Amino acid sequence: MKKLSIIVSVYNEEASLEKYFEACFSVLQGVCLVKRDYSDFSELPLESEKSELLSENKKNHASGQKREEQGVEEYQAELLFVDDGSSDRSPLLLDRLASENPDLVRVIHFSKNFGHEAAMTAGLDYAKGDFLIFMDADLQHSPKLIPEMLRKYEEGFHVVSMVRTKNSSAGLLKNLTSSAFYFVLNRLSPLHFEANASDFFGISKEVQEVLKKYYREKVRYLRGYVQSVGFSKTTIEYEAGERQGGRSHYSIRKLWIFSKNTLLSFSNLPLKLGIFASVCSAFLGLILLIYTLLTRKGAPSGYATIVVLLCFMFAVLFFVVGIIGEYIALLFEEIKDRPIYIVSEVKNLDKNFYSKERKF
């Protein structure tokens, strides 16, 4: 039987974890062999009510009717939560889920907040499924789309990218800047990136192994790696829903740093701006020389002209030097070779599993 791994990045998501687990478990009942002990974030109900709920879950599981309706194979599932150093009650809630659902829920706790990309990387490293689905816990990535992603995988696609057609929680400015980011990225990079692709995607075991072995940069953009790694790809359009509690953890500053690092990581074109600027400067100088010779007049006099030209030239020069500095900063991060993340504790997992499996 094939295995399905669902990797969920969690950072201060206590307000939405209960809703996410309920929604995801309901979907998994339709496509996977899942067994659930009673799990709730409030006080446990009466024993009679608990038995009734367990009996109903077992009945739904045994019938297999949902799996037939979804039109996909039967899978054995694991729900892998990666706690990215949360400071709220998320770690406690995740541990409770893991203890009450040992056959389904796995939890990885980081020693501190390493970032969303690091959390997805940990899920990539520890997941054991034949098909891996990455999503967030705020329900903007709807679990109801999991069966459709599985169907695409069963059709033979190794990469299933989810493309946003609408984002209910994003304003006009964020949507415009997102479109501009992909426009610039596709112009600067020799690779093609699907516009409005999100961190909601699925990959096969083969793609997972390639990403684990060859894509180990410290400054990361996993969804970009997924789109650039090759293999057969397909897309599914979806509308991102409203956040079910909490707020976005991406500030304007974080988005700027993330966008800048991504552009620099996937393109060396900015390094060539110095050549372009030098050609433009030489061309302007040649025009000025021809103008002087034809009119038999001296070069334009006055301090204003000289100051403007010098300011322009130094602006171009420092801009190019700044770009080179950004690339050197990226190289510096790679040379330090510090870990992408540090695991402090795991639940229902072997903490040393990934280190044992690594052969590179």
Question: Positions of the model-derived regions?
Answer:
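Short, well-formed alpha-helical segments that are part of the catalytic scaffolds
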Residues: E13-K35
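A conserved acidic beta->alpha catalytic loop
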Residues: D83-P91, L139-Q140
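Cell-envelope/extracellular polymer assembly enzymes that use nucleotide-activated donors
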Residues: K3-S5, E78
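Acidic helix N-cap motif at the loop->helix transition within catalytic regions
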Residues: E18-K19, D88-R96
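Short beta-strand/loop segment that forms part of the nucleotide-sugar
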Residues: C32-Y38, G71-G85, I108-H109
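Hydrophobic helical membrane-anchoring modules
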Residues: K3, R223-F360
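Acceptor/aglycone-binding surface of glycosyltransferases and processive sugar-polymer synthases
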Residues: R96, I108-K112, H116-Y126, F131, ...
